[in-house]
Amino acid sequence: QKTRVERICHELGLKSFAPLWHKSQPQLLREQVRAGFESVFVGVYAQGFTQDWLGRRLDERAVSDLEALNKSHGVSVGGEGGEYETLVLDCPLFSRRIKINRAERTWDGVRGEFLVKDAELEGKA
């Protein structure tokens, strides 16, 4: 993706800026958690993941578990290969947070999704 963006920027006479390029993925995820990002896993698509990941919070323990999956199955800790997708429910930039009222899990034995069926915005405490 970076190469594609750089090529397009070059064609348009723009410069590409990628401040997170070559940064430690586990470190970046831990910084997001410490900064107050609340995210959940909404899709897992790689060997090593189980359905228990669906709807799971991305927290310090999840980052450690992603590092273990990297060692055992080659999973990109940051999900850069499409191994997983997350949904941000809250972060310091949001004026309200997303509250999931109802969700369903789909699982085919190898991959699955956490499908949000009902959600609402709520004020922050």
What are these regions (language model features)?
Residues 1-125:
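Nucleotide-activated chemistry modules centered on ATP-dependent adenylation/adenylyltransferase
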